[in-house]
């Protein structure tokens, strides 16, 4: 397991929230952050602090994206017509690794990135090994034949803690998903409140 993958629980502790809604999250048992200073009482955040926290939470949710990559996604959302915050969510949910996670092909978004990177997924019949690959409405995402019996896949499809959202159609018998449409914020089944408008405010300072 990579260091970035093993850090997933640290993200929960850092945020003080169970951001993926997982039963084993350590924040279900403790109310302070990671590290030796985690138990210190937290003061009231400034406006900047609130905006930064919203950004860090959204970055963390999608696999602790690197700042350069997340900023590039925001910049594209800002260039597009319409509401920048909604555009940002749509772009993040259009990532191949996000769709693999939403389709319940794997148990976590970290596993989804590794699964894609290791060549286990195809889009419209072509192998794609880039987690940030942007899917379009109508794209068909499939677990490649040689990977369909992997234990991680079989276990993930049985997870009861989350459902497949209605903007993705899935056949778990064939391990095929269709990205029906780009979702809006209200469509996305976040386990906690996400505030992309605060992310827009952060980058607009």
UniProtKB/Swiss-Prot annotation:
The Gene Ontology biological process annotation of the record reads:
ribosomal small subunit biogenesis; translation
Could you tell me the keywords of this UniProt record? Ribonucleoprotein, Ribosomal protein, RNA-binding, rRNA-binding
Instruction: Mention any Pfam family matching this sequence.
Output: Ribosomal_S4
Supply one GO molecular-function term: structural constituent of ribosome
Instruction: Give all residue intervals belonging to the S4 RNA-binding domain.
Output: 94-154
A GO CC annotation recorded here is: small ribosomal subunit
Using the UniProt annotation, give all residue ranges assigned to the region (Disordered): 1-46
**PANTHER family annotated for this entry?**
30S 40S RIBOSOMAL PROTEIN, SMALL RIBOSOMAL SUBUNIT PROTEIN US4M
Listed under subunit, the entry gives: Part of the 30S ribosomal subunit. Contacts protein S5. The interaction surface between S4 and S5 is involved in control of translational fidelity.
Family membership noted in the UniProt record: Belongs to the universal ribosomal protein uS4 family.
Q: What does this protein do?
A: One of the primary rRNA binding proteins, it binds directly to 16S rRNA where it nucleates assembly of the body of the 30S subunit.
Q: Which HAMAP family match?
A: Ribosomal_uS4_B (MF_01306_B)
What is this protein called in UniProt?
Small ribosomal subunit protein uS4
What does UniProt list as this organism's lineage?
A: Bacteria, Pseudomonadati, Pseudomonadota, Alphaproteobacteria, Hyphomicrobiales
């Amino acid at each position: 397991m990579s260091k970035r993958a093993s850090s997933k629980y640290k993200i929960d502790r850092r945020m003080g929230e169970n951001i993926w809604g997982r039963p084993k999250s350590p924040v279900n048992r403790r109310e302070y952050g990671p590290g030796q200073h985690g138990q210190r009482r937290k003061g009231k955040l400034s406006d900047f602090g609130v905006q930064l926290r919203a950004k860090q939470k959204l970055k963390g949710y999608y696999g602790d994206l690197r700042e350069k990559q997340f900023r590039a996604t925001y910049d594209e959302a800002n260039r597009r017509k319409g509401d920048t915050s909604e555009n940002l969510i749509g772009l993040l949910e259009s990532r191949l690794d996000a769709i693999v996670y939403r389709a319940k092909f794997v148990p976590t978004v970290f596993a989804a990135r590794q699964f894609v990177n290791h060549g286990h997924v195809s889009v419209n019949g072509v192998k794609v090994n880039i987690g940030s690959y942007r899917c379009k409405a109508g794209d068909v995402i499939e677990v490649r034949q040689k990977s369909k019996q992997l234990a991680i896949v079989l276990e993930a499809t049985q997870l009861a803690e989350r459902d497949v959202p209605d903007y993705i159609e899935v056949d778990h018998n064939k391990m095929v998903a269709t990205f029906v449409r780009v979702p809006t914020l209200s469509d996305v089944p976040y386990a906690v409140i996400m505030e992309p408008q605060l992310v827009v405010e952060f980058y607009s300072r």
